[in-house]
Amino acid sequence: MADVAGPSRPSAAAFWSRDFSDEEQSVVYVPGISAEGNVRSRHKLMSPKADVKLKTSRVTDASISMESLKGTGDSVDEQNSCRGEIKSASLKDLCLEDKRRIANLIKELARVSEEKEVTEERLKAEQESFEKKIRQLEEQNELIIKEREALQLQYRECQELLSLYQKYLSEQQEKLTMSLSELGAARMQEQQVSSRKSTLQCSSVELDGSYLSIARPQTYYQTKQRPKSAVQDSASESLIAFRNNSLKPVTLHHPKDDLDKIPSETTTCNCESPGRKPAVPTEKMPQEELHMKECPHLKPTPSQCCGHRLAADRVHDSHPTNMTPQHPKTHPESCSYCRLSWASLVHGGGALQPIETLKKQISEDRKQQLMLQKMELEIEKERLQHLLAQQETKLLLKQQQLHQSRLDYNCLLKSNCDGWLLGTSSSIKKHQDPPNSGENRKERKTVGFHSHMKDDAQWSCQKKDTCRPQRGTVTGVRKDASTSPMPTGSLKDFVTTASPSLQHTTSRYETSLLDLVQSLSPNSAPKPQRYPSREAGAWNHGTFRLSPLKSTRKKMGMHRTPEELEENQILEDIFFI
């Protein structure tokens, strides 16, 4: 090993020494450099040109040891220098190729470390994203489980509802089959009844339908022929069909002791106007016998034999109205219409027996007919409301036209009055003397005042009679004040002529409404009504009294069955419509 003398020994020269430690030390292995061609001896690498660096500490140690051990000899000096040289080897001793290889290796290591960091970061991000996705999938799985449970619950509920609906359908089907069987039985019974009608016709002479509380459908309300619309024709047809299948209670006013003896259902009102003939009975006999079978509890009354309705004013034929055989003088021995004796009529009602099935069937038919009648009335109500709206619009237009014509007439009247005043004043000045001028002025003023009063009275009458404005009467009443001044009595006459026309139209309207209501409500409580007569005079309103009607209503409420109460409820609905 080469040793370099320090500054303490300037005379010392470099020398080579061989130590046993050189053989013991192994060859240095550097990756990428240690190959067969790259292995060199240590002696070649050691050049005497001083590429070797010595540290200051080593040099000082070597100098101290040299100073302390001067007498020991060269052997110790060589050993110390060789040890320092072995420890001071560096990379500068390598060749350029080795240095390049080492630099490339360092760059590769740096790049690999950077890639490692990038891949680690990427793996961490991917791991986090995967964890998020896993959490989302778990949440979705939980939601799916909950939805599945809810759907299972709904499925169970739907199954329960389906089972209930199937039960309901089965019950309805059973009810339908039962109703069909009942209808078939009812039809068979109707056929049997129709076959029995022929056998009962022989006894129908003794048992007239008027003996019961059944009004004749074709003569119950016979109105005079009036112009009717198609709606009224259909309503009248439905009313006739309805009357054929229902009992018609009619109010009759009796003394109080007679009302206590007789059921309210059997009372009839039979009145006759003096100048009117009775109508011919046209009711069919088997239908009345059928009603007699249905209603055996109704006690027959003699007055019902003659209960034949009359004409349009609701003025009726009046036979005596005593109910019991205690008054034989007030009624003839036989009825002039049905030609039957009272004995046969009194004793013939107990022969018929009640038929429960026919009662039920007829009550059902009545209910159906009442419901149909109610529907028809609702339709008619809508139509009438529509027509009423149209009539109201027409009435408003007519009122506007009338108001305009009144304004025009007032203007014309004022102009005529002004012209007449001027003409009369000039004529008076010409034909009369000057001393009478004051009196003429007074007369002019009074005449003008009377003319204005007459015009105002005429317009007030026209306001009252808006339904039928009479322009001819107004122009006829207005006269020339100069020739014939109108007295105050003419104003009263004009007002009275206008008011009865209004009363007549309103009474006609109320009478038609009351007749319609009474025809639609056969089982409803009878109400006091007035029947004005055009030919025989006014009807006596005092004949109908409320006190016996209240007692009859109480009796009717006590003897009614649930079926009759239900019919009355439907009839009240129809009456309300």
Curated annotation (Swiss-Prot):
Coiled-coil ranges per UniProt: 91-167, 358-402
Swiss-Prot/TrEMBL keywords: Coiled coil, Phosphoprotein
Biased composition annotated in UniProt, kind: Basic and acidic residues: 254-263, 449-468
Source taxon at top rank: Eukaryota
Region ranges (Disordered): 251-282, 425-444, 449-492, 520-540
A UniProt-annotated Pfam family: KIAA1328
Tissue: Widely expressed.
Function: Competes with SMC1 for binding to SMC3. May affect the availability of SMC3 to engage in the formation of multimeric protein complexes.
Protein's name in the database: Protein hinderin
